[in-house]
Amino acid sequence: MIKSFSVLIIVAILLVFGGCKKKNTNSIYDNSYKDEIELTRKDFMSYMARNHIPGGNIAIAKEGNIIYSEGIGLASKDLDVPMTRHNLLRIGDVSQLFTSIIYLKLVEEGILDPDSTVQHYIPEYPETDFKLALKYLPYHTSGIRKQGPSESELPGLNPSIQKGLESFMNDDLTSPPGWYEEVSMFNTNLLGAVMERATKKKFPVLLKEYVTDTLQLANTIVDNSVVPIEGRADFYDQNMLGQVINAPFHDTRYKAPSFGILSNAEDLAKLGIAILESDYFSEEFTEKLFEPCNLYGNYKSKMANGWILTIDEQGRDVNASSGSVMGGGAAILMYPEEELVIAYAVNLTIGNNMLPVFEIANHFLQD
């Protein structure tokens, strides 16, 4: 009797485990948005095919939850490794969003004063004809010149943000601070250097302490091309014939605050959720994050802390950011009132392209 009972238990266990299907950890898929997600997949795959992008990941958040996240294509063409939603990719200019959060948190804590000068924190920085206050840097209104092509992709090893200041610190300002918007990576890199000096901590440590650990963004770190990083996808570029090739070696550490962060679509979507809902960001903090500044002629800035501020054709507020760097690119789109966040990242050099996320947003918005 005991033997028969034991056999029945074993059979029951085998039936239970035999009937279990392996969970697909490469995707999050909320069936209540099935139609919208299928249209999203179609649009994103079409975008990748048109632009010969080997791989990417995409994520969508609605009302505080990730409703869709997936890796599509290849993380490595050479090794035929599929892209997953966890793979890390270069996000280019979108890195500024993380830098601005650290900056505003340091202001909130009283460690940085927006009205203090750059020279107050970096005494060796040359004096300028006009007061160069910190508050101009995250708005790209400092008058610091735009980087040249060769400065965007310095050859060799460039491990220091502080060393990267030498490219521009002795140049004259192109206009009085606060007059015009001119996007330059030098603004964000200088802001990162100031934060390092004020806190006596390196930028990767600040990113971890003020953003990724608190918000549990497990796949967002500063890139370091000279060491292995688990989950980092391979990077690709295109030659003169439009053929996809391996991207050349590029050490982005000197521009970590502006272009040098690795992340993925899901972490970007989680960042959007946190900005909209997390207690870590007070209402006052969020207002400052998206607050335009005044420009010459009583105009308002179109950017704030790395975010493009705009409205769509239906009059809805939209906050967006896109980025491109050697071997990668990304974009994030937020509709605050609709609690909608859309993000993607790819492993091919692309121009700053917001088109895919705007097209996808239409599937989730009621006109």
Task: Briefly describe each language-model feature range.
Residues 30-89, 113:
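Short, conserved catalytic-motif segment at the N-terminal edge
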Residues 21-26:
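Bacterial lipoprotein signal-peptidase II cleavage site
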Residues 3-10:
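Sec-dependent signal peptide recognition
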Residues 312, 317, 349-367:
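Short, gly/Ser/Thr-rich active-site loops of penicillin-recognizing serine hydrolases
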Residues 331-348:
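Short, well-ordered beta-strand elements
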Residues 129-324:
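Short, surface-exposed loop or secondary-structure junction motifs
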